[in-house]
Amino acid sequence: MGKLSTHVLDTAHGTPAAAMRVELYRIAASGTPELLKRVVTNLDGRTDAPLLSGDEMRTGIYELQFHVAEYFEGRGAELAHEPFLDLIPIRFGIADEDGNYHVPLLVSPWSYSTYRGS
């Protein structure tokens, strides 16, 4: 069976992004998001368990929401009253229930990058 995982790296400090709040949503055909999980990254910037695995893995559209402003404020970063990046949504599709989907996020208070990992 496949699985979904993530890994968040803080490129401003050169460290894993520990204690970042992440939410996983499944997007219904109507476009309505359904909250599946709320997690917090561990000391390695990962989740302690896959976000989806086994019977939870279904084809469809999903969205990960990363609470980056909250994370950087917790690290003591001086952010504007309206931070440039607050919440980063990454919407993606799962086409193969048996596939491994890894969604890394490399992030600073001013930029981010993602890709499909393995």
Curated annotation (Swiss-Prot):
PROSITE patterns linked: TRANSTHYRETIN_1, TRANSTHYRETIN_2
Recorded catalytic activity of this chain's protein: 5-hydroxyisourate + H2O = 5-hydroxy-2-oxo-4-ureido-2,5-dihydro-1H-imidazole-5-carboxylate + H(+)
Record EC number: 3.5.2.17
Molecular function in Gene Ontology: hydroxyisourate hydrolase activity
Binding site for substrate: H7, R46, Y115
Pfam families linked to this entry: Transthyretin (PF00576)
The keyword Hydrolase is annotated on this UniProt entry: yes
UniProt keyword annotations, A-Z: Hydrolase, Purine metabolism
Gene Ontology BP annotations: purine nucleobase metabolic process
Physiological role: Catalyzes the hydrolysis of 5-hydroxyisourate (HIU) to 2-oxo-4-hydroxy-4-carboxy-5-ureidoimidazoline (OHCU).
Further details from the record: HIU hydrolysis also occurs spontaneously, but more slowly.
The family this protein is said to belong to: Belongs to the transthyretin family. 5-hydroxyisourate hydrolase subfamily.
Subunit structure as annotated in this protein's UniProt entry: Homotetramer.
NCBIfam families reported for this sequence: hdxy_isourate
The protein's name in its UniProt record: 5-hydroxyisourate hydrolase
